[in-house]
């Protein structure tokens, strides 16, 4: 029987871990970043590297920020090349992966589900 989900290889997991560490370091220092990101606390929720190790999809979630989603995406995309250069200096590979940023909707979805469950339990209590 075939597996429904494909597991990441050791190399994919190792590269994702290194990229995560480098991104955290860059975000803490604020080096080489768009100025809009200085006062924007971000959490890197997960990093998924493609099987060919050429693309790293980085999922993030902002906390308590005045910036809009589009502002954050623009700032991250403006900083993308500097981040990739920093990652290139940290890894010893022939190619450095392209960095793609994605908003992580997991937290938003969890809040929606929680609200639905609460409203459903309230309806059950009233019936």
From Swiss-Prot:
Q: How does it assemble?
A: Monomer. Binds 30S ribosomal subunits, but not 50S ribosomal subunits or 70S ribosomes.
Please list the GO biological process terms of this entry: maturation of SSU-rRNA
Q: What does this protein do?
A: One of several proteins that assist in the late maturation steps of the functional core of the 30S ribosomal subunit. Associates with free 30S ribosomal subunits (but not with 30S subunits that are part of 70S ribosomes or polysomes). Required for efficient processing of 16S rRNA. May interact with the 5'-terminal helix region of 16S rRNA.
What PANTHER family does this protein's entry cite? Answer: RIBOSOME-BINDING FACTOR A, CHLOROPLASTIC-RELATED
Q: Which UniProt keywords apply?
A: Cytoplasm, Ribosome biogenesis
> Protein name, please?
Ribosome-binding factor A
What SUPFAM superfamilies does the annotation carry? Answer: Ribosome-binding factor A, RbfA
Source taxon at top rank: Bacteria
Q: Could you tell me where this protein is found in the cell?
A: Cytoplasm
Predominant place of localization: cytoplasm
- Protein family according to the UniProt entry: Belongs to the RbfA family.
What organism, scientifically named, is this protein from? Rickettsia typhi (strain ATCC VR-144 / Wilmington)
GO cellular component terms listed in the entry, alphabetical order: cytosol
Please give the Gene Ontology molecular function terms for this protein. Answer: ribosomal small subunit binding
């Amino acid at each position: 029987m075939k597996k429904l989900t494909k597991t990441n290889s050791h190399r994919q997991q190792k590269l994702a871990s290194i990229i995560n560490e480098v991104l955290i370091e860059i975000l803490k220092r604020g080096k080489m970043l768009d100025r809009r990101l200085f006062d924007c606390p971000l959490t890197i929720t997960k990093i998924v590297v493609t099987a060919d190790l050429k693309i790293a999809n980085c999922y993030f979630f902002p906390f308590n920020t005045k910036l809009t989603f589009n502002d954050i995406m623009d700032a991250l995309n403006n900083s993308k090349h500097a981040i990739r250069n920093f990652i290139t200096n940290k890894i010893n590979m022939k190619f450095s992966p392209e960095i793609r940023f994605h908003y992580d909707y997991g937290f938003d979805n969890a809040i929606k589900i929680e609200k639905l469950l609460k409203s459903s339990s309230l309806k059950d209590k009233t019936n």
